Amino acid sequence: MTRVSEEAMKDLLSVYFIMGSNNTAGDPLTVIEKALKGGATLFQFREKGEGALKAGDQTAFARQVQALCKQFNVPFIINDDVELALELDADGVHIGQDDDKAADVRARIGDKILGVSAHTLEEVLKAEKDGADYIGAGPVYPTETKRDTKAVQGVSLIQEIRRQGIGIPVVGIGGITVENCVPVIEAGADGISVISAISKAADPKQAAEAFSEKVQATKQSAHS
């Protein structure tokens, strides 16, 4: 296995769907399948918070989700659990600033995809140096899903990353909807990451399709 290229990573980040079993009132596997059908390009398994599955149940559910992702040829990333990622041979790991250090995680996961959440330029540069393949920059907008989030910062960090000429792939994170996703891409992000705007949508497939269309159109016009 070799490290994912910067260009490939930028494409994968287009519509990054993040979900756990407790992020929907519907059947989780059905919701995930619909999102993948609708055009989600990357998936992150994030089983956290109230009502989340524990230990064995979590692993069993993760395996089912991983199988779905394989079916749609979408990389399967695990949030903040290196052991589980190694046990399942997941495609990668995403960590926050409070989790294990990025350099340690990189050493453990080899060439798998490594994503790191960052809230300041300093954190971005450190993550890049430590071997991150992409940055999750945010929170861009207010979010209900993560109760412990840092201060909302709009697209300022994304703009600053690009102004400084930092080329690492970046995905916007936090409170992103179909209605407000365009400025995130215009600021220089390679994609948007979404939980509830897809997981709680009346039609997750349609929601994923709408994100996909908006993101691709905005990326094309930004590069033309």
Swiss-Prot record:
Its cofactor is Mg(2+). It catalyses: 2-[(2R,5Z)-2-carboxy-4-methylthiazol-5(2H)-ylidene]ethyl phosphate + 4-amino-2-methyl-5-(diphosphooxymethyl)pyrimidine + 2 H(+) = thiamine phosphate + CO2 + diphosphate; 2-(2-carboxy-4-methylthiazol-5-yl)ethyl phosphate + 4-amino-2-methyl-5-(diphosphooxymethyl)pyrimidine + 2 H(+) = thiamine phosphate + CO2 + diphosphate; 4-methyl-5-(2-phosphooxyethyl)-thiazole + 4-amino-2-methyl-5-(diphosphooxymethyl)pyrimidine + H(+) = thiamine phosphate + diphosphate. Mg(2+) binds at residues 80, 99. One of its GO terms (biological process) is thiamine biosynthetic process. Binds 1 Mg(2+) ion per subunit. It is an enzyme of class 2 (transferase). Pathway: Cofactor biosynthesis; thiamine diphosphate biosynthesis; thiamine phosphate from 4-amino-2-methyl-5-diphosphomethylpyrimidine and 4-methyl-5-(2-phosphoethyl)-thiazole: step 1/1. The keyword Magnesium applies. It comes from the Bacteria. One of its GO terms (molecular function) is thiamine-phosphate diphosphorylase activity. It holds the Pfam family TMP-TENI. This is Thiamine-phosphate synthase. It comes from Bacillus licheniformis (strain ATCC 14580 / DSM 13 / JCM 2505 / CCUG 7422 / NBRC 12200 / NCIMB 9375 / NCTC 10341 / NRRL NRS-1264 / Gibson 46).
